[in-house]
């Protein structure tokens, strides 16, 4: 939808369609090339029309709906288009044969897949993929023991020495792919805080800049990433055409003196007997960092640094579902998550503006943005300025102009520091069995790329063992 009008799709021929919008949509092709492009092929009409009232009688739909255990036709329709439906026609290289809760979840070669290799052999090469679902600790142990064909997610960087030491024993190799994210352990201070006094405090840029200067990122880098990473804010990585070294390095110097002076200047000079600063209402300045076991030992270090400058901080680990529930209800003080796709930040600018429910620093403002002001909380002028710049980016068909406009967004982020970065620049670790072939030595990772989906996984192969 552009300009409040749904797009128009025109069929040109059996293989060509034309998309028309009310206003220019400069990010449309990039979105199609990203994970969002799946939506274009997720609704096979010849199958799903049997479960839609436009094409099937109400009587027939009612019978099918009740037989499937649903109350409404749209519940049946949603169930039939779910990726776990084994009967749903797919263009994927593999189709699902045993969906969750099966263990393992099984995908099998799609005999109708549309790609062939240079010799005319139909792809994919691999006939069957077993996806075993475990907790992160078990995943890491299995990877170290060589019990996984390939693993790219949930590998804990703290296990890096073990991954490297056990390569020969486990019969695997460790690839170091380029990380397209802007950092790890990103701290999103809730600007839509429900406590009005705390909201006023965290809404002051001096508070956020003070907390940034209060952290020793070199210690965080050594403790969590063996010094391999680089202290930085949440900025596009050096491999990105949007890279901005000025924002990357803003306020990252460890300097508690600067932190103290900024907090004093805010009027938070008075402290209690524990050295914790006193709010205007007489209460101590206290915040909680909420995380989903995202390098909690590093966050305990962060809490110590912040407490040392008079902002009492504790860390709370939550189950992912509860974490999401609390942030949706704007109940968190500080939420922690990793980078997204800062390589191409225009596709998902969650860390540069209140863009979506993943913009943990200002979900209330993101609701205002997504609803054109109908919902959520109206943001201050500087954030509205960022939103207006992004709307201009959406309407520009010139990537150089998109980069120029986004630089203005980065400038405003550098000035305001709406989110606080810690460390970034670590490679994405990929553990691959030695019998697993055609996996590139170097690739770019990112959520929008659906990595490793951007590495021609249909060409992966398993070497025969005599």
Regions found by a protein language model. Give the residues of each.
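Extracellular/periplasmic solute-recognition and catalytic clefts
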Residues: 95-108, 112, 130-196, 218-225, ...
